[in-house]
Amino acid sequence: MLLAFLNGTYIGNCSFTGVSTSRYQHRATMGIALYQKYTGMGIGRAMIEKLLEIAKEKGYEQMELEVVADNQRAIRLYESIGFQMYGKLPDNMKYLDGTYADAYWMMRKL
């Protein structure tokens, strides 16, 4: 797990987990969380790029992620780093107000 701090204040994290089944051991899945007020500063990009570097060094060949379909800012970031969409999960998330959100699966070869 990578932790991000700015002037000693925690602002986010990024991590990945390998897929454990033997024939899928070349794959890993990642997630990132960054406080909204720190987006657009290159911090998320730097965290993801470092995470991809670490995953490749550990022998992983592809990184996968899920992103909420209406999070266009994150989708643009992932695409700019080389991720491609390969699937859609309808009603993947259910919010407290009872509404649903779709998600996209994205993947990048390392």
Regions found by a protein language model. Name each.
Residues 64-67, 79, 84-99:
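Conserved catalytic-core motifs of GNAT/GCN5-like acyltransferases
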Residues 102-110:
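Terminal substrate-recognition subdomain of acyl/acetyltransferases
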Residues 44, 48, 71-74, 91-96:
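Short glycine/proline-centered loop/turn elements that form peptide/ligand docking sites
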Residues 48, 55-66:
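Conserved GNAT acetyl-CoA-binding A-motif
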Residues 1-37, 48-49, 54, 109-110:
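Acetyl-CoA-dependent GNAT
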